[in-house]
Swiss-Prot record:
GO terms for biological process: small molecule biosynthetic process. Disruption phenotype: Impairs the production of tropolones but leads to the accumulation of talaroenamine. Residues 185-287 form the Fe2OG dioxygenase domain. Its EC number is 1.14.-.-. This is 2-oxoglutarate-dependent dioxygenase tropC. It comes from Talaromyces stipitatus (strain ATCC 10500 / CBS 375.48 / QM 6759 / NRRL 1006). The gene is tropC. SUPFAM superfamilies: Clavaminate synthase-like. GO terms for molecular function: dioxygenase activity; metal ion binding. PROSITE patterns: FE2OG_OXY.
Amino acid sequence: MSIGDEVIPTVDISAWLSSTASPESKNKVVEEVRSACNKYGFFNLVGHGIPAEAREKIFGCTKKFFDLPLEEKMKISVDKSLGKSFRGYEPSLIQTHQDGLLPDTKECFITGAEIPADHPDAGKFSTGPNLWPEGLSDKEFRQPVMEYRALMLDLVSTIVRILGQGIHKAFGHPSDVLNDILINPSIPMRLLHYAPQENPDPRQFGVGDHTDFGCVSILLQQKGTKGLEVWYPPKETWIPVPVIEDAFVINMGDTMHRWTGGYYRSARHRVYITGERRYSVAFFLNGNLNLKIKPLDGSGGEASVGEHINSRLAHTLGDNAKYLR
């Protein structure tokens, strides 16, 4: 499905992961990823090697969590997380991604890298222990969630290395120029639920028009659902991103956009409300929060990764930004 001739491309990275693939095959992967991120800021990724069982398990966990009674979910709401770590349950109507509209209808469960409460950095922004629901055992929920997170960290590390090769081709920088974002990174993950509405208010979305804050996002969409759209400026239109079998949706965030001088584009996107229930899982590589980046094309000054992401998140939370103070 596309608007006109525009469709978000699909890239098969199996050759990049293969020890026997030719250099030409690997270079083809780099070129396809580079082109997609430069033109659209989005692409569908297949040939990733993530088992179907792991994807099915994480959707099972997502459904189990959101089936819990609201009072159970509220026991681990984000206001109960340590300091500014922002972990746990985020109820519906907490965030407003698009100014001037009603709050987003999505609800989510947020985890990050597991940082013990006695760690010196625990309680700092996006850093601390995770919160877990009492009504779900470790075996049926915590364990598969953390296993999936580990798979996503491996996958996003692969994507960053492919992106680095693309930067090398474009600007001549070393191919490992982006690797610093993988050192002790902030890697929040959100299990997401969008409740169905037959007649939604036109001023409200599941998630309003926005760009992601960090470097690279990995989205797993549920089969048979719709709602995600990407803005394509050359044609001033929204391009739907339908669910593709075995695919992850990859997109660039604002930190990557700034770092590459806009070469890898952070694209606006949104999720509109439908009459069908929708689940998805979003993994975000924000990067090392202490890292200061300068545009690789020399176009601007230095910026702090952590300060940028904290500021953007606080803006979407509005009065609820008290959870970050």
